[in-house]
Each structure stands twice: as structure tokens, then as C-alpha cells.
């Protein structure tokens, strides 16, 4: 296939932009089915003697993944800026697809099943997250700063709806007591086979991105790991040039911890405090994802109008209110109010965070800076769950959920000091 057409001014055409957005649709099957809903629940129930032990084991897999991503993402980004990020995007995507498919064939009754399953999952999860480093790095080249917000929003919105689409297929075809197409249910094979759905979905819908995305001229300087480390060290030494990036990443480190914890424990809180049934829990998940998808799509245009910083600030304020309402909610009705607020503003928060980072990254260093972006999202991601867990155990789930306000408030205060115009100018994107 020839090079994709570009619009006036050298910007990629619509086919390139939409192929980039479609990758969000593709990869969301992994986070929705494997990490959040189906395989994680299957693992905790089938690979341990009780759900509590299973949850502890699964959390270790998540923690190991997060530490590996935090360690690898910055250097992987620097390496990709030298060698061309497209090849690394394809490599990480295919590795995630292969490892996810392999999870299907790890049975809970085989020797060392827990170690094997968690090891394969960690490989898949790390490959997935590193792929996002290279994927996100393309955003800065897709549009000028004043249009980046809506494109990031398109991607996040499609991602949420893609995850829902894959979940719907899984619930109809694989999960019923009598799955369609004669899929066997022995030893939970039908549940493990949802990993094949994820692998196929991810691979199929990633193909346009693999075909249309191209590295900018000046990349492809050759794979030199030693030079990549030196480039990374030089960037760290000169971070004073990019002080707005540093402030933003510290702010994101905090408010993202609150966000991640809401996603991880929202369902647990709904069941433990408000007695949600499985059907109500599925409805809760759908509401969050639909709200997040619509919010990301709508607020992409708001982002381009008022700026990424203001959009993030608005979302952090709304999430703070939602957290407080959820912690104090006297009835299910008030809990649903908080859930809808969370759903509407989670998507814009994630989308605007990505678009603001894209405005702040200097040319030829996109992957490296998005490596730092991934680092800030993972290096302290255990703090929110740890604080909520301890306070829930000592006091109550309501106190635990309420404690997440600390992350949103501190993150919002640091974000308030970020100068968006200065950050864009320092990156040479004004």
C-alpha cells in the first residue's frame, strides 16, 4: 500500500487519523475483558482455593506489571525515537495478542498453573502498555495543537465503545451456561476462550493502524540501545527546559492514582456497601463505559476550545464531587448520581491528559516523553488501592472511598500551577 495522503500543510489525512483512532477500539478489548471483567474474575475464582487468595495473586500480577512498565517505558520511548516507533507499536501489539491467546490454554489444574498464568498475563499487560507509549506518541503529528483534543477524544471514545462491543460479544457467545457454536464449558474453557476473542479483535482492528501510520522523517536512525540511554539521560538533565511537563506529570501521578482506584474498586464498593447483584454490577460497568465514551467524544471539542489544562481541571473537580457524593451516599439513588458523574468525566480526564502531553512534547522526542507519561501513570499506582484497602479494613468502605479525595485535590492543586502556553512554547509547538 502506498503512503497515505496528507492534507494541506503536511498533516496526515482522514484515513491516517481514523486508523489511529481505531487502534483504541482494538486494544480496549484487552483492558475490558482480560484486566477488568472476565479473565480477572475467572482467575480469582479458578486458580486459588478461595476468592480472597485469588484476588491477592491477581493483584501481584498487576503490581509486577506496573513496576515493569514504569522501569521500561522511558527507555523504550527513547529507543523508539531513534529506531522508529511504528515497528515497536506492531511488535508490542503482536506480543500482547500472542500472550493473550496463550492464556486460553493455561488450565487451573496443570502444574504451576498460577505461575504460568500470571507470567503470561504480565507479558501481555507489559506489551500492551508499552504499545500505548508508541501509539500515543503519534498523536502530536496527527494535528496542530488546536485540534489535538478532539482527535484524542475520538480515540478514547471509540476505545470505550470498542470495549463494550467486545464485552457484548463475550456475554452473548462465550459466557452463557450453554455457549454458542458448541464451545465447551469443561474446566471453564468457554471463559478462557474469551482471550481468543480479545486476541482476534485486537489484531483485526489494529491492521489499519499498522498499514497507515508512518514514522516521521528523521526517525529510523538505527537501533542503538546505548545511545538511547544517553538520550534519555540528556533529557532528564535538561528537564528544567520542560518544567511544565514535570509539573503536569506530577499532577497526573496523583489524580490518576485516584482514577485508577475508582476503576479497580468501584464495583467492589457497589457490592459491599450497596449490595449490588451481578446484573446490577454489569449495568454499573456499562453506565461507566458509555458515560466515559460519550464524555471523551464531547469534551474533545471543549479541550480544543478551552485547553487541555482547563479540561483536566474541570474533570478533576467533577470527579472530586462524585467521590464525595459516592462516599456519603445515603441511598442507591445518590450512589448512581455519583456513578454517572464519574462516567461522564473519566473519559475527558484521560483524553485531555493525553492531548495536553502531546502539546508539550518536543519533535523527535515523542515516544520518549510518552514513556515518562506511562511512568507517571504506573510508578505510584499502588498508593490509591493501598490507602483505600487499609482504611476500608480499619474503618469502612465509605472512609476508604472518601480518602481518594486526597489524590484529586493534591493533583488539582499542582495542575493549577501548570502554564499550558509556556509548555507548548517550550516544545516548539506554538
Task: Describe these PLM feature segments.
Residues 32-55, 264-281:
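Short amphipathic helix-loop junctions that connect adjacent transmembrane helices
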Residues 2-18, 214-250:
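Juxtamembrane intracellular "pre-TM" segments in multi-pass secondary transporters
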Residues 87-102, 310-325:
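Structural signature of the two symmetry-related core transmembrane helices
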Residues 52, 174-200, 390-408:
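A membrane-interface helix-boundary motif in multi-pass transporters
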Residues 71-84, 294-308, 392:
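Helix-to-loop junctions at the C-terminal end of transmembrane segments
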Residues 104, 201-212, 403-430:
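Multi-pass alpha-helical transporter architecture, strongest
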Residues 104-119, 327-339:
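Helix-loop junctions at membrane interfaces in 12-TM secondary transporters
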Residues 130-143, 348-361:
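Intracellular juxtamembrane helix-capping segments at the cytosolic ends
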Amino acid at each position: 500500500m502506498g503512503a497515505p495522503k496528507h492534507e494541506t500543510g503536511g498533516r496526515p489525512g482522514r484515513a491516517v487519523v481514523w486508523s489511529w483512532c481505531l487502534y483504541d477500539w482494538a486494544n480496549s478489548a484487552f483492558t475490558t475483558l482480560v484486566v477488568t471483567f472476565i479473565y480477572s474474575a475467572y482467575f480469582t475464582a479458578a486458580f486459588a482455593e478461595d476468592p480472597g487468595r485469588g484476588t491477592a495473586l491477581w493483584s501481584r500480577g498487576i503490581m509486577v506489571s506496573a513496576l515493569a512498565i514504569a522501569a521500561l517505558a522511558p527507555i523504550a520511548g527513547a529507543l523508539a525515537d531513534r529506531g522508529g516507533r511504528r515497528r515497536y507499536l506492531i511488535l508490542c501489539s503482536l506480543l500482547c495478542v500472542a500472550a493473550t491467546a496463550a492464556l486460553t490454554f493455561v488450565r487451573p489444574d496443570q502444574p504451576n498453573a498460577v505461575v504460568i498464568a500470571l507470567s503470561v498475563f504480565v507479558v501481555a499487560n507489559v506489551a500492551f502498555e508499552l504499545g500505548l507509549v508508541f501509539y500515543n506518541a503519534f498523536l502530536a503529528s496527527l494535528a496542530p495543537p488546536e485540534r489535538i483534543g478532539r482527535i484524542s477524544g475520538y480515540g478514547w471514545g471509540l476505545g470505550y465503545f470498542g470495549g463494550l462491543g467486545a464485552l457484548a460479544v463475550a456475554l452473548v457467545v462465550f459466557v452463557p451456561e450453554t455457549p454458542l457454536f458448541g464451545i465447551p464449558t469443561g474446566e471453564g474453557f468457554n471463559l478462557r476462550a474469551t482471550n481468543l476473542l480479545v486476541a482476534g479483535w485486537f489484531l483485526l482492528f489494529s491492521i489499519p493502524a499498522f498499514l497507515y501510520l508512518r514514522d516521521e522523517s528523521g526517525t529510523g536512525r538505527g537501533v542503538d540501545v546505548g545511545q538511547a540511554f544517553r538520550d534519555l539521560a540528556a533529557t532528564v538533565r535538561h528537564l528544567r527546559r520542560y518544567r511544565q511537563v514535570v509539573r503536569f506529570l506530577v499532577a497526573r501521578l496523583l489524580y490518576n492514582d485516584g482514577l485508577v482506584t475508582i476503576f479497580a474498586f468501584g464495583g467492589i464498593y457497589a457490592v459491599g456497601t450497596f449490595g449490588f447483584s451481578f446484573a446490577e454490577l454489569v449495568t454499573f460497568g456499562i453506565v461507566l463505559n458509555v458515560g466515559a465514551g460519550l464524555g471523551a467524544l464531547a469534551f474533545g471539542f471543549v479541550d480544543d476550545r478551552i485547553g487541555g489544562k482547563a479540561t483536566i481541571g474541570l474533570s478533576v473537580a467533577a470527579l472530586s464531587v462524585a467521590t464525595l457524593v459516592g462516599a456519603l451516599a445515603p441511598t442507591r439513588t445518590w450512589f448512581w448520581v455519583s456513578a454517572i458523574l464519574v462516567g461522564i468525566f473519566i473519559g475527558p480526564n484521560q483524553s485531555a491528559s493525553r492531548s495536553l502531553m502531546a502539546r508539550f512534547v518536543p519533535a523527535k522526542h515523542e515516544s520518549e516523553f510518552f514513556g515518562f507519561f506511562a511512568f507517571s501513570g504506573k510508578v505510584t499506582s499502588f498508593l490509591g488501592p493501598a490507602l483505600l484497602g487499609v482504611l476500608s479494613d480499619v474503618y469502612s468502605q465509605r472512609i476508604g472511598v472518601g480518602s481518594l479525595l486526597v489524590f484529586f485535590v493534591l493533583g488539582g492543586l499542582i495542575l493549577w500551577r501548570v502554564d499550558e502556553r509556556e509548555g507548548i512554547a517550550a516544545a516548539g509547538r506554538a
